[in-house]
Amino acid sequence: MKKIRLIIISLLAGMCTPALSTPVNVTDTIQSTEDHIKGRVGFTEIDFLSGKVLSSHRREERFPMMSTFKVLLCGAILVRVDKGLEQLERRITYNKHDLDDYSPLTSQHIADGMTVSELCNAAITTSDNTAANLLLSTIGGPEGLTHFLRSTGDSYTRLDRHEPSLNEAKPGDERDTTTPAAMAQTLQKLLNESVLTEKSRKKLISWMQEDKVGGPLFRSVLPAGWMIADKTGAGDHGSRGIVALLGPGGKPSRIVVL
């Protein structure tokens, strides 16, 4: 974990700094990283406004989503809110038997439950697994999320299992996977295009901006004044992932999937 984190920090530092100084070949850095970890690294960087691909590596290959799927999940929830099919203020109750091993926020509210908004906040900002599973139950489970993604034009991303099983990340298993290209394009649709209302787009970005888990990755190497809204993921077999919206001057300019 520590070695992979240091490699990612080095990669992201090289990617972010060029915007302010001398360009660096990101692909060369990624290939060097692959040689070091004896594994694959998928990467896509696109322009936030146009969706144009700025740089990529293995962008069409499948990689496990792990907890990064929680951004897509909350995007699906917000679409239902926009359509009047869900309310962020609706309270969902549960009991101790519903709790996953990693439930930092939901474990504190067994008595009173949590609202849909609070569950989305918990799923994204602390990666609370129980929050994610409770939210999945409101949209038809993993199949429901996959169906939603197909409706946005994403024909690659798929969710097949609940937390924590989806983090198995077994090599060659296509369950619970996406491609860097598909994830980046879907994020661009959710965060900048008309899939969500402006109010819901801002809500989703605000949850990502409050991420309390991704500090050691992007946030620790960003130049001063840059904005970031992100979500990280970790799974078995050394799998790690991050999706992020970031840019200089406090304004979003690119989407990165790694």
Description of each model-found segment:
Residues 8-15:
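Bacterial N-terminal signal peptides
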Residues 51, 63-92, 255:
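Active-site SXXK
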Residues 68-71, 174-209, 240-258:
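Active-site-proximal alpha-helical segments within enzyme catalytic domains
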Residues 83-108:
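Short, glycine/proline-biased beta-turn/loop segments that scaffold the active-site neighborhood
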Residues 99-134, 142:
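Conserved catalytic neighborhood of penicillin-recognizing serine enzymes
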